[in-house]
């Protein structure tokens, strides 16, 4: 176990222990004669052992110097004090399944070097009878393990190897394991993306880099947060040291070390192999980059790729691994018999998991094991000694190797977990394009020196013409999503039984439900106005009969004094008098309603013995009605606030002093009245925020829908944000979002203060701020990791991707919106903006036009009762990035020129859902965008051609160039939108570099004449365009 506090996942332990005992009861693979199983793990140089795999599979950790004894009716664990505490949650009667026997722990006794404990365990083994199962071939070097093995020998216990039985047990992965393996594959493919970019940089700039240096760089990618992004919070490492090979020195052994020789980046093939080991689960990837390949080498690559795909397709449940091997050999032989001769025929892959390579489940000619659904295989095909004639002797021999990690599915195609690292030929070919020397007549010797020889630039298929292909693929995928969208929406809404809103039943405001409750006060008997504060009613006399009115029926009342009389006017709520949500509260709107009543009373005493005048009753009634109305409206507002709010479970406090904790945090919104700091601490089932004043706010894990951690990089605050599933009532208000943050740096700056560029105080303060930001990021990140471990990865924090952010106006002010793995958020400004992508039906772009600088984005949710969410004023330059992001999230989008009234649109849809989908559903949004595409296609002939522009500029005199310079610049700016169409016609990076070089040459030619022109006065027309002035 590591130095960090570990927590045993109780449910997962019993789930897997139950699988183990069921496998044991079947008696397969020699387990029928085994009555007990004993395992111990110690120090070893081998990172992959069956014992460590068993401990990781059962407990989630490699637990050294601990004996695990499994009997049919009991489980014993011998370990140190800390390890006994680790198993505390599963000992005694804590088990959740009757199939798993009781777990007991024994505390190590170092006084006799555990001789007494060993004797107890051996007695239990002998009582069980039969042989003890063990991984006989595994050797460990620790003193504790040696003592245990010696005790077994002295006790006469016979060991029996059960490696094959546990190989079959570990081979089929459960849902938790599949999830971790998928994440491991994501880390592997993310590292390959970074490695591929590194290769392009090396080849393009002709750098000399050693194979061993690249191996270390690729290993670092596994832990680089910029490469892994959301996966950086997991414990990830490499399965083995990355292997980088080129220049004819190739080996297909997994323990091959990358050489100290330099990478051959100008010819042949570069083979790269590495894999991620995330949370102890392994995946692997091998790719071959072809550098300026011959046609024979490309054909060989296609044949090897076809053989790999054939092996992947043959790995179906029920198939023998030897038959799968034969299919791979036959496919390669059919494609190219010569390649089959130099194939690495030992095996074409193997099963993987916690152990990188399971040799007993290898795809080889002699392995007759049967494939099962849920198994994970690494398919690896490598061929050596392939001729590469184009590059002479140096390019021979070449080698090609391709490897992927796949998950066997019960039905349908197998899942290629590393599919994002594309293995197709055009994604792994690098070619050079020799740029011809500029042969135009140039008289200036400086220009010739500047031009030099022709340059070489890397041309990747994905960088040039394939952009058009990617755009077409995106459009095809969007069409598929559009069809699926209507089908799924129609099916979903039909199950819901229509989209009609359920009207909330309003509380019946009846004054007195029984006659006994009617007041018998003296004012009622005297036919005066009586205000009953107990039942929120007003009793007024009408034709000599006291009539009660509930306070909710009184719209308002007014009092006036005219001469000797006081008037009280009461206006009642009637149908049609109220407009809004409460307009439909009348049960019988067609009945007769009283609109107003006016009472008059004298201000003069009727008799000198009276203590008050008759008008006193009206004045008192007026005051009490006003007070009652105010109180009733306040209570109604509180009840409305409580609607939808849930009462959280009780927070279970953890007594451990090492609970994850953050101090000096502020809270938003202002649940606590005063702006004071506090601490946030993670407990067993939730968080508790405690202010310095003692205020407490609890947030439970099971009510958190999304948890976000936003670092303080380029931000003024660092924060943790919780978006809740159900609103929670804190105080008298309900909240669905709560945020804990710390301010970083100065929010305001004194502009009147004198600043010097080399002011030591300012430089020191900036350095201190950078250091503080680093410490804060580390502290918050550590808190998130500890919470994740505390909850056994059941609770995770999501972080926004700053690189995918874009500006927009979700409410009233412009903010930066950033995507996360599951949402689009803005957490810095308040109120926060959070859209859950899984709840989004589609996205529509409004006001998309070349004449406009901004557009709007509207989110339509799967629940049509929810009001669509709009983000306005997004810069047009961000639309392609947003489309690509939505495409990767499999969200259908559409665009149009006009802005729609979404309240009316949604009402029309929900009024008649069947008719809406029969008429095409949401496809009506794409009508405008289809028309726009047709108009764009008709304008392709007017696209800007830089080469023609260069020719016309080169043929003119220097003075002509000066005069036309501003016009050319404006033309470049205006025609910027047409560059995409030029690229679709085959323009690559080298062409663009050539145009830039030509522009620089012309600029240098023009510089001397400009210098001369500056010495004499110029007219306004002869100067450069204002767009060129800086």
Swiss-Prot record:
Compositionally skewed regions (Basic residues) per UniProt? 1015-1030
Q: Where is the composition biased (Acidic residues)?
A: 929-951, 958-983
Annotated organism of origin? Caenorhabditis elegans
Coiled-coil ranges from the UniProt annotation: 424-445, 623-645, 987-1007
The identity of this protein, by name, is FACT complex subunit spt-16
Q: Which gene encodes it?
A: spt-16
Organism lineage: Eukaryota, Metazoa, Ecdysozoa, Nematoda, Chromadorea
Tell me the segments the record calls region Disordered.
Answer: 435-477, 491-514, 927-1030
Segments of skewed composition (Basic and acidic residues): 435-449, 464-477, 998-1014
Q: Name one GO molecular function term.
A: nucleosome binding
Q: Where in the cell is it found?
A: Nucleus; Chromosome
Organs and tissues of expression? Expressed in the germline and somatic cells.
Q: Name the source's superkingdom.
A: Eukaryota
Is DNA repair included in the keywords of this UniProt record? Answer: yes
What is annotated about its quaternary structure and interactions? Component of the FACT complex, a stable heterodimer of spt-16 and hmg-3 or hmg-4.
Q: Which UniProt keywords apply?
A: Chromosome, Coiled coil, DNA damage, DNA repair, DNA replication, Nucleus, Transcription, Transcription regulation
Q: What happens when the gene is disrupted?
A: RNAi-mediated knockdown in embryos results in failed hatching in 83% of animals. In addition, these embryos lack the anterior pharynx. RNAi-mediated knockdown at the L4 larval stage results in failed development of the anterior pharynx. RNAi-mediated knockdown at this stage results in defective cell cycle initiation, duration and completion in embryos, and abnormalities in chromosome segregation.
């Amino acid at each position: 176990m590591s130095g960090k506090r570990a927590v045993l996942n109780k449910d997962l332990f019993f789930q897997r222990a139950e699988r183990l005992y069921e496998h044991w009861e079947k008696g397969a693979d020699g387990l029928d004669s085994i009555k007990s199983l004993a395992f111990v793990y110690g120090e070893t140089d081998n990172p992959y052992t069956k014992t460590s795999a068993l401990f990781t599979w059962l407990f989630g950790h490699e637990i050294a110097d601990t004996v695990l004894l499994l009997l049919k009716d009991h489980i014993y664990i011998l370990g140190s004090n800390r390890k006994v505490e680790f198993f505390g949650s599963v000992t005694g009667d804590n088990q959740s399944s009757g199939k798993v026997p009781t777990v007991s722990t024994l505390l190590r006794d170092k006084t006799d070097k555990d001789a007494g404990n060993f004797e107890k365990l051996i007695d239990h083994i002998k009582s069980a009878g039969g042989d003890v199962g063990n991984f006989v071939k595994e050797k460990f070097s620790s003193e504790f393990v040696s003592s245990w093995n010696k005790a077994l020998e002295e006790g006469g216990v016979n060991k029996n190897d059960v490696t094959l039985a546990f190989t079959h047990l570990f081979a089929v992965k459960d849902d938790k394991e599949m999830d971790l393996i998928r994440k491991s594959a994501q880390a592997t493919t993310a590292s390959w993306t970074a490695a591929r970019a590194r290769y392009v940089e090396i080849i393009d700039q002709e750098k000399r880099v050693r194979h061993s240096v690249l191996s270390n760089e690729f290993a670092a990618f596994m832990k680089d947060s910029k490469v892994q992004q959301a996966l950086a919070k997991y414990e990830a490492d490499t399965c083995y040291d990355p292997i980088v090979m080129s220049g004819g020195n190739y080996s297909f052994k997994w323990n091959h070390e990358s050489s100290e020789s330099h990478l051959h980046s100008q010819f042949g093939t570069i083979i790269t192999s590495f894999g991620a080991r995330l949370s102890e689960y392994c995946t692997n990837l091998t790719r071959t980059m072809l550098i300026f390949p011959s046609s024979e080498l490309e054909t060989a690559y296609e044949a090897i790729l076809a053989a790999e795909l054939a092996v992947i397709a043959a790995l179906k449940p029920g198939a023998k691994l030897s038959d799968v091997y034969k299919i791979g050999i036959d496919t390669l032989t059919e494609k190219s018999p010569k390649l089959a001769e130099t194939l690495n025929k030992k095996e074409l892959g193997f099963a993987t998991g916690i152990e990188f390579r399971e040799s007993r489940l290898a795809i080889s000619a002699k392995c007759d094991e049967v494939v099962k659904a849920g198994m994970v295989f690494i398919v690896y095909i490598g061929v050596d000694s392939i001729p590469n004639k184009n590059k002479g002797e140096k390019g021979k021999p070449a080698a090609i190797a391709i490897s992927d990690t796949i998950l066997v599915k019960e039905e349908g195609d197998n899942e290629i977990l590393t599919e994002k690292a594309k293995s197709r030929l055009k994604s792994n070919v690098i070619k050079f394009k020799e740029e011809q020397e500029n042969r135009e007549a140039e008289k200036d010797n400086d220009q010739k020196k500047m031009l030099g020889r022709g340059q070489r630039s890397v041309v990747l298929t994905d960088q040039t013409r394939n952009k058009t292909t990617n755009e077409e693929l995106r459009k095809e995928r969007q069409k598929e999503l559009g069809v699926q969208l209507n089908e799924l929406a129609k099916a979903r809404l039909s199950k819901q039984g229509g989209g009609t809103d359920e009207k909330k039943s309003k509380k019946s405001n009846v004054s007195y439900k029984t006659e006994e409750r009617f007041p018998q006060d003296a004012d009622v008997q005297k036919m005066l106005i009586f205000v009953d504060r107990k039942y929120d009613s007003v009793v007024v006399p009408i034709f000599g009969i006291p009539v009660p009115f509930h306070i909710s029926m009184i719209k308002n009342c007014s009092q006036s004094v005219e001469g000797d009389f006081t008037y009280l006017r009461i206006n009642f709520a009637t149908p049609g008098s109220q407009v809004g949500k409460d307009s439909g509260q009348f049960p019988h709107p067609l009945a007769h309603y009283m609109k107003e009543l006016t009472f008059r009373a004298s201000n003069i005493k009727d008799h000198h013995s009276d203590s008050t005048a008759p008008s006193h009753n009206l004045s008192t009634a007026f005051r009490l009605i006003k007070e009652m109305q105010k109180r009733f409206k306040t209570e109604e507002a509180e009840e409305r606030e409580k609607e939808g709010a849930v009462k959280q479970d009780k927070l279970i406090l953890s007594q451990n002093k090492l609970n994850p904790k953050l101090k000096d945090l502020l809270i938003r919104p202002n649940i606590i009245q005063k702006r004071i700091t506090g601490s946030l601490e993670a407990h067993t089932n939730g968080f508790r925020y405690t202010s310095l004043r003692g205020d407490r706010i609890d947030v439970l894990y099971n009510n958190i829908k999304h948890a976000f951690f936003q670092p303080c990089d380029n931000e003024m605050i660092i924060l943790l944000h919780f978006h809740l599933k159900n609103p929670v009532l804190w105080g008298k208000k309900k909240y669905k979002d709560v945020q804990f943050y710390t301010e970083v740096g100065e929010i305001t700056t004194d502009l009147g203060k004198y600043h010097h560029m080399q002011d030591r105080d300012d430089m020191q303060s900036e350095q201190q701020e950078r250091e503080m930001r680093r410490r804060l990021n580390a502290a918050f990140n550590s808190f998130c990791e500890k919470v994740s471990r505390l909850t056994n990865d059941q609770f995770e924090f999501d972080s926004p991707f700053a690189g995918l952010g874009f500006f927009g106006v979700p409410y009233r002010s412009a903010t930066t919106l950033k995507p996360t793995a599951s949402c689009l958020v803005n957490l810095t400004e308040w109120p926060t903006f959070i859209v859950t992508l899984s709840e989004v039906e589609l996205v529509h772009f409004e006001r998309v036009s070349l004449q406009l600088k901004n557009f709007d984005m509207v989110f339509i949710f799967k629940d049509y009762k929810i009001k669509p969410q709009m983000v306005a004023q997004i810069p047009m330059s961000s639309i392609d990035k947003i489309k690509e992001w939505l495409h990767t999230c499999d969200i259908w989008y559409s665009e149009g020129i006009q802005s729609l009234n979404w309240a009316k649109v949604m009402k029309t849809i929900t009024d008649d859902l069947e008719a809406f989908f029969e008429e095409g559903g949401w496809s009506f949004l794409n009508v405008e965008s289809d028309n726009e595409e047709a108009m764009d296609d008709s304008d392709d002939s007017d696209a800007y051609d830089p080469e023609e522009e260069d020719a016309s500029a080169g043929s003119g005199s220097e003075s002509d160039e000066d005069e036309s310079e501003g016009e050319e610049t404006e033309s470049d700016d205006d025609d910027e939108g047409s560059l995409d169409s030029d690229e679709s016609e085959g323009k690559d990076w080298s062409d663009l570099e050539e145009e830039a070089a030509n522009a620089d040459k012309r600029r240098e030619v023009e510089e001397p004449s400009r210098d001369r022109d500056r010495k004499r006065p110029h007219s306004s027309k002869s100067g450069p365009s204002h767009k060129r002035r800086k």
